[in-house]
Curated annotation (Swiss-Prot):
This is Ribosome-binding factor A. Disulfide bonds: none annotated. PROSITE patterns: RBFA. One of its GO terms (cellular component) is cytosol.
Length: 138
């Protein structure tokens, strides 16, 4: 492998180290939120899933994708996480062995909404008709 070959790419989601650290951070944040360690009333009433974390190449920024169960109150949950960002960053630093504690940025994971939209499209009469005609032809 040539020395100038870059490891990882945007298509693969980053280097192996980025992926490994992102998964470790994801587990840490999911544990913190499930244990209710933040002690915020806006967070305590919600079950929050953390489906993905993306790390910057220098591992100094973690973009954490979240989704409250049922997809409700995303704005309230996002605001509560922003208020507790300093605490969460400290907890992540304590649980994940890195040279620097990554800065944390929260985003709502919209893949669930997109999957639901596609599922609804697949159930429309026009698509069902096309699918059935394809089955009859084969």
């Amino acid at each position: 492998m040539p020395r100038h070959h870059q490891r990882g790419s945007a298509a693969s989601g980053g280097s192996q180290r980025q992926l490994r650290v992102a998964e470790t951070v994801r587990h840490a944040v999911a544990d913190i939120l499930s244990q209710g360690s933040a002690h915020d009333p806006d967070l305590e009433g919600h079950i929050i899933t953390v489906p993905e974390v993306r790390m910057s190449p220098d591992l100094k920024l973690a973009t954490i994708y979240i989704m409250p169960l049922g997809g409700r109150d995303t704005d309230v949950v996002l605001a509560a996480l922003e208020r507790n960002k300093k605490f969460l960053r400290g907890e992540v630093a304590r649980r994940v062995n890195l040279k620097f504690a990554p800065d944390i940025r929260f985003r709502v994971d919209e893949r669930f909404d997109e999957a639901e939209r596609i599922e609804k499209l697949l159930r429309t009469p026009a698509v069902q008709r096309d699918l059935n005609s394809d089955l009859e032809e084969s």
